């Protein structure tokens, strides 16, 4: 486990907050807590590389803080996030349905690869 945190994603040229990103503990499948990566980018700023840059910075920070693995859960229909996870080096390890019926893919990133 590592120290957790949340950060603002800020557009460099304007200083405007355009999203957020963080790592936090989660309980999955009754297992011990794992570290989950989550992010949200304002719709006007998506598909411009902000999430990739922010995720790379947070992965590096998580490794510095002692994380061994990071996980993310992504709706299978959210192809931009699926592609981002793959580009970052996450691998799909599980699949489940939420109570609401949403299908979720679970991805894992192994730190210090």
Q: Where do the PLM segments sit?
A:
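Acyl-donor (CoA/ACP) binding surface of acyl/acetyltransferases
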Residues: 4-113
């Amino acid at each position: 486990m590592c120290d957790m945190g949340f950060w603002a994603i800020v557009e460099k040229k304007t200083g405007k907050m355009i999203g957020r990103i963080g790592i936090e503990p989660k309980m999955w499948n009754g297992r011990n807590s794992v570290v989950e990566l989550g992010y949200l980018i304002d719709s006007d700023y998506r598909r411009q590389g902000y999430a990739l840059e922010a995720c790379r910075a947070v992965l590096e920070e998580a490794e510095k803080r002692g994380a061994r693995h990071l996980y993310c859960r992504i709706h299978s229909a959210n192809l931009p996030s699926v592609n981002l996870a793959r580009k970052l080096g996450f691998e799909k390890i599980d699949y489940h349905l939420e109570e609401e019926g949403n299908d979720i893919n679970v991805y894992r990133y192994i730190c210090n690869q």
